[in-house]
Amino acid sequence: MGADERSLEEIVISVPYGTRKKASFTGSAGIVGGEKISSSQVSSVSKALQGTVAGLQSFSTSGQPGEDANVYIRGVGSVNASTTPLYVVDGIPYDGKLANINSQDIASVTVLKDAAAASLYGSRAANGVIMITTKQGQAGAAPSIELTAKYGFSSRAVADYDQLSTDDYFKLQWEGMRNRYINNGKTEAEAATLASANTVKALGINPYGTAYPQPIDQNGNLVAGAHTLWDDSWEDAMTQNAHYTDLSARVSGGSKTSKYYISLGYLDDQGAYICSGFKRYNVRTNLTSDLKSWLQVGMNLSASHSIQSYPKQNDTRTDNVVLFARQLPSFYPVYERDPETGAYLYDNNGNKIYDYGNYRSGSYAGMNLAQSMLYDKHDRKRDAVTAQGFVLVKPMEGLTYKMTMNLDYNSLFTHDYTNPTYGKRPIGSSAKGNTRTTGFTINNVVNYQHTFAEKHDITLMAGQEYYEYNTSNFSGERSNVIADGYYEPDVASTLVDFGGNADQYKLLSFFGNAEYSYMKKYYASVSLRSDGSSRFHPDHRWGTFWSFGGSWRIINEKFMEPATKWLNNLTLRASYGAQGNDNVGYYAYQALYSIGKFDGEATLHASRLATPNLTWETNLNTNIGVDFSMFGDRLTGTVEYFERASKDLLFSRSLVPSSGFSSIDDNIGKLKNYGWEFTLSGTPIHTKDWMWKLSVNATTYKNEIVQLPTEVMWSGSKKWVKGGSLYDYYLYEWAGVNPDNGNPQWYYYDNGEKKVTEDYSSLTSDDKVKSGSSLPDVTGGFSTDISWKGLTLSALFSYAIGGKLYNNDYTDLMGVGGLNGSSKSVELINRWTPENRNTNVPKIVDQQTSYFTSSSTRWLVDRSYLRLKTVTLNYSLPHSLLQPLTLKDVNVFIQAENLLTFSHQQGLDPEQPLNGTVSYRYPAMKTISFGINVKL
């Protein structure tokens, strides 16, 4: 956003197999400067992109350090194939994780959004392209040494949901039990007496001490004098004082014929939860040398080693660290307590004894992750190497030939160990696995550029590329660990599983591009690429994709001369093209077989039919845009309309039962995304001492289903129909609480008439109604940079307006069908009672009433939010102080990541997947750090 204030003639952007001046570019692209990336305190570059470019959505669905974000460019163009954009590093498609890349090494990020911009990458660019350019040295420059150090602290960006206090919990537990006894035929007095007598028994513990064996009286109140002897926070026990350390050193420079850039980096990004974090070590060397006036060679070499501590998360397992920290209420102690005094109990060594709560009700009996996780291991170790070399030959003026070879090597080593001593029914296990991938690319590109009669400019390009990807993996697990503290599988006695496989993918491509401009007013471009993919049958292996684009620099027309006093640029652009998508699996067209076992003998049976006619998914992309700038480029902007029509989408087509198979894959789907993008940047203040720059972008688009294999398809809470959207919720409609009895109600339809029922089981799919979309109406970001002399304040905000989330997290916290010894929301205080009939929270009844939290519109939440993604306060020391120290520049700064978040529901992190499903995910991190940057 606003990465560069230079004129269009000066701005150079990265494009497939080269660079172009922004003024002559007919496609759609957004640029993010390296300073924006380096100011972000995240371990993956993908998480730094949210809010920076119109049309790009980056969803940090896990705050686990070292995890990449889910990135989408102009929506989703497929249902069952990949929706991930192509990442290109220094001109070559990149196969590794973005978390492997040191953000301090990045010079710029260019986002290619339409066919004219990205079609030269062919089938791999169906979902857009994100081009990362790393820093280079400068020819003829003296050696420059730059050191950067950051140190800070991290915590949850959004505090967890507010939960019931112990006193309120016991009161509501009593109330639920009393209501159950009444429902079972007891009188109110009998029910109250029984509830008082059994509340402690139901929860398994008495935090009020033995002096108050029945802490809740027959009126549902605390007995006089009763108070809690402990109030433990499991959230505190499961989280840590996370530290953030980022160190890097960079050396760059060059001679008249060469340039170099060398860097070292170290990152230690500890997670908010115990036993989670990410460490990374980086090295990079970029070298370029002119051996002759007509011959240039270069090499880019990078390597990283990372260790990611990755506890269980993002699911409903009881050992999910996020879920465990939330689900245990404060009256269950972290450490064992004296039931009479509440004092800690100690072992023979004087250490506190962790409480495993075998007395607890519910599924967490016998568990204490606060201790057992300390003896477990869940590590992901990754080694990544990228080696790239090129030769550039200039045989004549305007003609170049470049050959580039690139190797991406990635090795992921996983180790999961559970100890045999601590935990729920511990027996111990050790599992190890390794996944190794190599991606090899070689391309040959010829470029020719010439100007005729000082008016006509042509650029021609032709190339060939070969890509080969190999992956292999194996994993094994053994259980019944016999010696704690030794983590290797051979310490376990029982083989649980062992397996492995290998896959290969090849792509051969031929491509070309032609560009023409006349008098720097009229520009045209055409691209063509043919890909041959090993994923399809030989008869359908080749796909040809194309694009054409044009632009008109209206500002250079003679009739615009009167306006040039205040208008600096006015350009109209348009493009149209087709891009393929072959990311449908390694063996998409082949019949598959499964190996099994029966009666002690090996078996082989068909698991999938061959699909020789399966072919490419295709995106047809339309883009129309207007670029403008005025007032000496103090105000610049872009407005674009786009349409992304996807056809031949991969779906399962039903087969007759006699075939022996339920379905077969086929190209039978169509989708369409269409919308608008807006970008506006300005410099309201520009004086000798003051500079203020502002930038804002916004994207709004719709998703439409054009064709499906059947009239109706269900995907969880989404109903897919022609003319609808992939993101449309269809749910039972919540009708609130019956004020007469406190029971939950839902709407249903009887011969078209809308009625109310308390019987959830009587509802049918015909009663589900369209309930909004998980797709936000508008997404984007805005930034501000204010400078005064040596002081600069920079901030980047991201936002979303509209759309809905389905909050699965909250259904557990709002369960009123028995509290079951798991934490509950403070909102239950507002439950229905005879004295509080006007409420949206049903009455509490301690019996099986799962329908109270069953799927309905009750759990939809507005996903609108505003987040202060990054903010930096930087001070550049005066040069007069640095000269005696022979220093070029010294900057000290304070940075914050995810400092502030404003959303519609307390406790909910609003950055959730595009499908809107919230499910016990590791929350985003807030990081505040102090740093210094020194240039020698």
Residues of each region from the PLM?
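Conserved small-residue
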Residues: 146-225, 475, 666, 683-774, ...
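Extracytoplasmic gating/loop element in the C-terminal half of outer-membrane beta-barrel translocons
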Residues: 220-223, 494, 533, 800-891, ...
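Short, polar/charged loop or turn motifs at beta-strand boundaries
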Residues: 28-51, 59-63, 71-78, 92-97, ...
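Periplasmic N-terminal soluble interaction domains immediately after the signal peptide in Gram-negative
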Residues: 1-10, 102, 112, 116, ...
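Short acidic/polar hinge/loop motifs at secondary-structure boundaries
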Residues: 47, 90-119
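Non-catalytic regulatory/gating segments with a bias toward low-complexity or hydrophobic composition
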Residues: 49, 56, 91, 109-110, ...
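Residues embedded in well-ordered regular secondary structure
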Residues: 22, 28-31, 35-42, 52-55, ...
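Extracellular/periplasmic, surface-exposed regions of secreted and cell-surface proteins
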Residues: 37-39, 83-84, 280, 286-295, ...
